[in-house]
């Protein structure tokens, strides 16, 4: 929806075609040329007012083997067969990172379940045993948000707060009423270094942080 409906509506269908064509010719004319998709095709798509595509997918959350396609994109109008590959590239680049994070979380959860069963004497919640602290290592807030949301399919701990809002928006949940994800008051190297500069000695620093 974000890309196939909202983005195309805001930046293509709801923009006057002359403006679309001017920008198209400016960018492609200065880089790879404008013969790939000519003005006639663009105008026909703009006049149509929507993307004539059918997207079919396995049910969300389904784990599939390698070589099993998870989505299939088909055109629904004979004049726009060229559109499929264009959209496939965009969908692929928006999906793979989230899918990898979900798979990593799933694999870690299997390991946690196995060894928690072997070594834990209490009924510790398995979903609270690992957490996501990856936000500062991601390339954007959007990537961090979706990656953490995917990880939260297997674990409930994340320091990526925007992921909680993303999950609420997309999955109709409410963190004030049900477990969605949890954060924690914690510290790490930069916090410890900056606080040490303030306190001047380790004992004072630790005492203040614990209190």
Feature names for model-found ranges:
Residues 26-60:
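Active-site-flanking structural segment that lines cofactor/substrate pockets
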Residues 1-37:
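Low-complexity, highly charged intrinsically disordered N-terminal segments
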Residues 43-52, 61-64, 70-211:
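Buried, small/hydrophobic-residue-enriched core segments of structured protein domains
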